[in-house]
Regions:
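Short, solvent-exposed loop/turn segments at conserved positions within beta-propeller repeat blades
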Residues: 66-71, 154-155, 201-207, 247-251
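Residue position within the beta-strands of beta-propeller blades
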Residues: 56-58, 109, 151, 195, ...
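Beta-rich, blade/repeat-based domains predominating
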Residues: 41-52, 91-104, 133-150, 177-192, ...
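A short loop-to-beta-strand structural motif that recurs across blades of beta-propeller domains
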Residues: 73-76, 114-116, 158-160, 209-211, ...
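Short loop/turn segments that connect beta-strands within beta-propeller blades
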Residues: 79-82, 119-123, 163-167, 214-217, ...
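Conserved small/polar residues in nucleotide/adenosyl-binding loops
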Residues: 284-294
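Beta-strand-rich domains and repeat architectures in extracellular enzymes and scaffolds
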Residues: 37-65, 69-71
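A short beta-strand motif characteristic of beta-propeller blades
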Residues: 33-37, 84-90, 126-131, 168-174, ...
Length: 295
């Protein structure tokens, strides 16, 4: 089975008028998206890029089973200048890889209850961390936070520091609870972690929040009164870009929150289906991918 990988270019233009103190007014939508789709075998989840413009992606597998250890998943690459995806990892290597990062020739990915460090050219596993003793089944996003690799555990409401060189890990215990943590990002100026939640309340209504976490004090701060089922998260130029499954097939599926004004706006003028993860590809652009649109 195939799904499509959607590449989106989002203009990061500044927002205009300042907000009111009590209730920020909605900002104007950003310019239209430029997009192109590429067919992928299976269910793509996250994307990453290197300096040469190669686009890497994780694929959960032919069936959408993100918590099963079925050896059905893989890592792939779309070489720069090509529209033909290629598999990097061998069959029976990965189960359901989700979060993905590229750094210094290596790909870091989450896979159910594992975190792997994989050679981006050969697909060889160069290091790993086994988090199964903590009994999670849904390790999700990754981010380098102040030089340390961190991962979100969506099903256990936790965030972990991991070290693929020593195969060790530890939990970042926050002072206030977090629920269904998903996307992670680091703000090097403010020295805070950004987090979005994929959560619902007892009635099934979207209740996920956009948060900042001080890694030293462990204090959690809400950034917006908006609620959703958030997935991908990127910090860029004093703004957060985030995807929302509760707004699937709408322009609001991807939004931009200006951290200076507190105002948010749709990052698209047309409907977007299945938007999940994002990657920055230049100073003024982002790329995102669309998952679960079957051919």
């Amino acid at each position: 089975m195939k799904a499509t990988l959607l590449l989106l270019c989002l203009a990061c233009s500044a927002l205009a008028a300042p907000p009111t103190k009590k209730q920020p007014e909605p900002a104007k939508p950003l310019p239209p998206l430029e997009k192109a789709t590429i067919a992928i075998d299976g269910h793509p989840e996250s994307v990453a890029a290197d300096a040469e413009g190669n686009i890497y992606f994780t694929c959960i597998g032919a069936k959408l089973a993100p918590t099963e250890k079925d050896k059905d998943g893989y890592l792939g690459v779309i070489p720069h200048g090509s529209t033909e995806p290629k598999k990097i990892t061998d069959v029976d290597t990965l189960d359901a890889p989700k979060g993905l990062l590229y750094q210094d020739g290596f790909l870091y990915c989450t896979d159910v209850d594992m975190v792997y460090k994989i050679d981006a050219k050969t697909g060889t596993i160069e290091g790993y961390v086994d988090l199964s003793p903590s009994r999670m089944k849904f390790l999700n996003d990754l981010a380098f936070i102040n030089g340390r690799l961190m991962v979100s555990s969506t099903d256990t409401d936790q965030i972990f520091y991991v070290d693929t060189n020593t195969s060790s890990y530890g939990e970042l215990v926050t002072k206030q609870p977090i629920y269904k943590p998903n996307g992670l990002a680091w703000d090097p100026e403010r020295k805070v972690i950004y987090l979005c939640e994929y959560a619902t309340d007892e009635k099934g209504k979207p209740s996920g929040r956009l948060l900042s976490i001080n890694p030293v004090s462990r204090e959690v701060t809400e950034l917006s009164k908006e609620r959703g089922q958030y997935d991908g998260l990127v910090y860029r130029d004093n703004a957060l870009y985030y995807s929302d499954w509760s707004k699937d097939k709408k322009p609001e599926a991807i939004r931009r929150l200006d951290l200076k004004t507190g105002r948010s706006a749709p990052a698209a003028t047309g409907p977007i289906e299945g938007a999940a993860d994002f990657i920055p590809v230049s100073y003024t652009h982002l790329r995102a991918h669309e998952t679960l649109r079957h051919l």
